[in-house]
Amino acid sequence: MDNIKKLGLTALAGSMVATAAHSAELSASGSWALSYTSEDDDAVNGQAFTMGDSVTFTGSGELDNGFTASVKYELDGGNFDDEQLKLDMGDMGEFAYGESNSGYGIDIASNMVPAVDTAIYSAVGTDTVSYGVARSAQDTGNLGYKLALDGGLTVSVEAARNTSAGGTDNTYGVTYTGIDGMTLAAGTGMTATGGTAEVESTTFGVKYATGGFTFGLQLTDVETEGSTEDEDGVHMGVTYNVNDDFTVGYVRQETDFSGNSSDEEHSGIQASYSMGSISFSGRVSKVDNMAGTAGSSDEDKHITMSIAF
């Protein structure tokens, strides 16, 4: 009986060693960031001061065939909300799967407009939808593929299937960087997450950098099945690098609703400044006619201090 026990313990120890040999080490990273936001007196948005509260765990390894496999988990506010598995196959492109799996399909083409702080359509306001912006596939169960070709051409596709409520999302994107200083982009997609009405997005963008200036323009059409309120978005912006430490920018977006709604208008100025390991970024933004509702407006002033260590 003792010999049988010893044999069992030896086998168990061997299996544990074998498992450990195939495990990947994860590194953890976080950030030091303190933000302050001031909005309209009638806005109720909780605490004005906030801090960065996310920790990202990453790991990667190279396979015998030269491919690189990587994994990422983000712990945000005490919850794991962003996970991604990626397989980089070199000249054959890369696959990625996970939640909040951005950067594939129409995402690579949906915003060519430069910003110093954040995209203007997400800077201010209480909209739960960024109107006039291309819809990408849902976060959960998102499968993406991207391939960089010779000559500066990159193509990408993403897909997601909601198995509980039905609905399939498929989007596609392409960018071209073969002209010095210029990026051209186009994307299209059909999203129907959760079995709701299908939403068709089509977008075209251009970005051009010369000297310290970067200019961007994005034209987007969003059509929702069964709705008369289709969206035509015009998004533009310019940034200027005054020097290596100081950058300023102006951004604007206008969304025309094809029905009787008023045009939604976002605008703002942004700036960033760094001195050694300390950096600041901020914005002053406003939105008029939120979600097409005449007279519904909001403004905000926001600044973030970050320390790298």
Question: What are the residue ranges of the model-derived segments?
Answer:
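Outer-membrane beta-barrel proteins
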Residues: 1-309
